Amino acid sequence: MDKKINPKKVEMFNSLKEFLDGKDNIFFLDYRGLTVAELTKLRSRVEDEKGALKVVKNNIMKRVLKDKDIEGLDSYLLGPTAVVTAFDEANVIAKIFYEFVKTTTLKVKGGFVLGEVYDESKLSAYSKLPTKIESISLFMSVLKAPMSKLVRTLKALSDIKV
């Protein structure tokens, strides 16, 4: 007996596979209890930071991950699941989740960041890292400090009257 494949499920599989193509950062959220307005606001905030959010069927997501040879994420695919991908700075997207966790029923399940499985606690720590811009700014201030000190010293020397 041949098992017929539902064309809608094939379409969902292909759509989800395309959604994940070229993405190194994938996050899994439990959106249970969120209102439509809260989920829409979350989606909007994620899109503002060059990310994308999609509510998925867990079994189809498992098949897509298997097709992409990504393992270790099945435990995050239980219950209502929203998948978020990040195109640029993944920790900025993670910060958004934890802002929402404070005020809504959103739960962060885990993720896949640059080829490594992150559980909720690891993602929480990751979200607290400085952004790329903040890191560059900090680095520049570290480089600038000795030069500023030298300039102040030379200025003080020139102010001394002999």
Curated annotation (Swiss-Prot):
Gene Ontology BP term (one): translation
**UniProt GO cellular component terms:** large ribosomal subunit
Is Oxidoreductase among this UniProt entry's keywords?
Answer: no
Q: Which domain of life is it from?
A: Bacteria
Q: Name one GO molecular function term.
A: large ribosomal subunit rRNA binding
The UniProt keyword set, sorted, is: Ribonucleoprotein, Ribosomal protein, RNA-binding, rRNA-binding
Q: What is the purpose of this protein? A: Forms part of the ribosomal stalk, playing a central role in the interaction of the ribosome with GTP-bound translation factors.
Family as reported in the entry's similarity comment: Belongs to the universal ribosomal protein uL10 family.
Self-association or partners: how does it assemble? Part of the ribosomal stalk of the 50S ribosomal subunit. The N-terminus interacts with L11 and the large rRNA to form the base of the stalk. The C-terminus forms an elongated spine to which L12 dimers bind in a sequential fashion forming a multimeric L10(L12)X complex.
Record protein name field: Large ribosomal subunit protein uL10
Whichever gene encodes this chain, its name is: rplJ
